[in-house]
């Protein structure tokens, strides 16, 4: 099936291309130098030579198995706009080393025992010398070797029944940021383990290394908790749950590909399903009408409402057991505990909260501080190296925010773009960027709440100005749709000083699942997530100081085809004509308009 797809994809690409074929991978390496000696063929069974490390050996088998199975040929190579001086094909030497073959991959690793945790070294070198019979890879850790393998996958192509790679090639590569990821939401709609594996495959190919797993929310509770098995009564069905064995499968699959899995249990907001099955008294406003038909009185930003009653002492005993049980399953040092979108009106439905606020003229900010003071020490003690993550709302929300949050807690910034990143880093916090205006992959698909009279408009009320149904966002609060160029061109450290830039530790692109499930998740995630992958691996600026968006275009179009060939149902970004005719679909002929 895949081979048939690739046969049609390859078409006539290499019919007249006996010259060198330099296929630049995605993400672009930090340093790559191609020679001009012509192609070198690879043996059909390139042997592994290196440490007897199970993770590396398994990764090599997957890598070479993929190369052999896919027999990949890109639909079109990187190319300058027509009439520009060519720079990607070689000097015309034809099959210069057809009598020589690459027989093995030689791997050297300084330390194969380094755990896959935050900050692990992922650097590598990959070298194929002129007329050599081996591919040489060096790395400081196992995880660097895995990154080298994914680069190798993309630079080997299939031509006339043989595998070839241009040589010599010398790559020295490492990531700009230690956190490079995507977020999946398995509460609004369930995502199967099989589809999670598919996202992990895409992540591995694009060198993303953190899967942020937003497991629970108000709508459903799909994860089994040993202390409270009744919580999954609020799953959508018995089959739409994750048991400990399911989670371990995801963790093992991810780890084999150099990907960390960071769980999120969103608290104290977005908390109704599951929790109410333990004790309805620990959940506030779950039975309220979420919008109250009057936005000033809303108890939630979307249906269904519910927040943990953080003035109720019983809440903390339950939270501790749930958190401890889930922490035992996940192996990463990090754990995300939410903290976003708390609604004061929800808390006001609780008599316990109202009585608490009356004592000493307390405020909602004091109430959230009470939650932070009670839960943070409890959550940190579970694991020696535990680090907590929270959404930025806990510090920056206009509704309610804590006065003090320990600075070792990592803040995930989703609102306010550059301004909020600046505020957080200036206060000394490490920050993960997830700005909705640039990185939310669910935006731009229109509204989803029902019984909405705003759509009942037959004539444009203001032809001169974009509005709800005519040129506006159509109910998508974070519209418009985030194109790959929007993502790729995001300079999220703009305006920060040196110290503040050092506190930005990476970026994660969320895909909230109000309108996503198994059927469409890969289509919405990919290949746009690959634009973020390059942004946080090697940046969006070339050695000449100019943005390389125009060079990225052909690589991401080819990468989309590569994802599909690997079983990842990525969406097309342009008509296929554009893929096969590089730059023919650019808005401007002038390739320097993006600086």
Curated annotation (Swiss-Prot):
Pfam families: Glyco_hydro_20 (PF00728), Glycohydro_20b2 (PF14845). Glycans are attached at residue 313. The keyword Kinase does not apply. Induction: Expression is induced by N-acetylglucosamine. It catalyses: Hydrolysis of terminal non-reducing N-acetyl-D-hexosamine residues in N-acetyl-beta-D-hexosaminides. Keywords: Glycoprotein, Glycosidase, Hydrolase, Signal. Its EC number is 3.2.1.52. GO terms for cellular component: membrane. GO terms for molecular function: beta-N-acetylglucosaminidase activity. Beta-hexosaminidase that shows a broad substrate specificity. Belongs to the glycosyl hydrolase 20 family. PANTHER family: BETA-HEXOSAMINIDASE, BETA-N-ACETYLHEXOSAMINIDASE. This is Beta-hexosaminidase 1. The lineage of its organism: Eukaryota, Fungi, Dikarya, Ascomycota, Pezizomycotina.
């Amino acid at each position: 099936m895949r081979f048939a797809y690739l046969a049609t994809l390859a078409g006539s690409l290499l019919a007249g291309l006996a010259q060198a074929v330099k296929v630049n991978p995605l993400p672009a390496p930090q340093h790559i130098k191609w020679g001009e000696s012509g192609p070198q063929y690879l043996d059909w069974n390139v042997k592994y030579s290196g440490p007897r490390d199970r993770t590396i050996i398994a990764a090599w088998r997957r890598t070479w198995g993929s190369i052999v199975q896919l027999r990949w040929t890109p639909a079109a190579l990187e190319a300058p706009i027509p009439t520009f001086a060519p720079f990607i094909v070689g000097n015309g030497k034809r099959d210069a080393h057809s009598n020589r073959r690459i027989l093995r991959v030689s791997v050297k690793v300084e330390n194969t025992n380094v755990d896959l945790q935050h900050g692990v070294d992922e650097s590598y070198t990959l070298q194929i010398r002129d007329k050599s019979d081996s591919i040489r890879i060096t790395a400081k850790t196992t995880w660097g070797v895995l990154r080298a393998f994914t680069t190798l996958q993309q630079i080997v192509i299939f031509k006339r029944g043989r595998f070839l790679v241009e040589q010599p090639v010398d790559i020295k590569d490492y990531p700009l940021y230690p956190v490079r990821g995507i977020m999946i939401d398995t509460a609004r709609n369930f995502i199967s383990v099989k589809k999670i594996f598919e996202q992990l495959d895409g992540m591995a190919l694009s060198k993303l290394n953190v899967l942020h797993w937003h497991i629970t929310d108000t709508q459903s509770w799909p994860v089994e908790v040993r202390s409270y098995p009744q919580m999954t009564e609020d799953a959508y069905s018995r089959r739409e749950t994750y048991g400990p064995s399911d989670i371990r499968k995801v963790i093992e699959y991810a780890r084999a590909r150099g990907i960390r899995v960071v769980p999120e249990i969103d608290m104290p907001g977005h908390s109704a399903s599951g929790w109410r099955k333990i004790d309805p008294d620990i959940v506030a406003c779950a039975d309220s009408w979420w919008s109250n038909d009057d936005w000033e009185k809303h108890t939630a930003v979307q249906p269904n409402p519910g927040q943990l009653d953080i003035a109720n002492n019983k809440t903390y005993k339950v939270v501790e057991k749930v958190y401890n049980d889930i922490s035992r399953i996940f192996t990463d040092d990090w754990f995300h505990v939410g903290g976003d979108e708390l609604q004061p009106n929800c808390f006001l439905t609780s008599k316990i909260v109202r009585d608490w606020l009356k004592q000493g003229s307390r405020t909602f900010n004091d109430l959230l501080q009470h939650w932070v003071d009670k839960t943070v020490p409890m959550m940190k003690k579970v694991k020696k190296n535990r680090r907590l993550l929270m959404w930025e709302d806990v510090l920056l929300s206009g509704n309610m925010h804590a006065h003090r949050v320990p600075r070792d807690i990592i803040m995930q910034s989703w609102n306010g773009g550059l301004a909020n990143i600046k505020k957080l880093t200036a206060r000394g916090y490490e920050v993960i960027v997830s700005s909705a205006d640039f990185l939310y992959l669910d935006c731009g698909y229109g509204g989803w709440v029902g019984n909405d009279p705003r759509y009942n408009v037959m004539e444009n009320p203001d032809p001169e100005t974009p509005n709800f149904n005519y040129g506006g966002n159509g109910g998508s609060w974070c519209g418009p749709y985030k194109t790959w160029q929007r993502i790729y061109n995001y300079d999220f450290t703009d305006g920060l000083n040196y110290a503040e830039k050092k506190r930005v530790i990476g970026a994660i692109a969320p895909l909230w699942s109000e309108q996503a499930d198994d059927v469409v998740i890969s289509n919405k995630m990919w290949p746009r997530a690959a634009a973020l992958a390059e942004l946080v691996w090697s940046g969006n600026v070339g050695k000449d100081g100019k943005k390389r968006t125009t060079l990225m275009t052909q690589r991401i179009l080819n990468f989309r085809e590569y994802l599909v060939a690997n079983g990842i149902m990525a969406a097309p970004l342009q008509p296929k004509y554009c893929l096969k005719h590089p730059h023919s679909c650019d808005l401007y002929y002038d390739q320097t308009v993006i600086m």
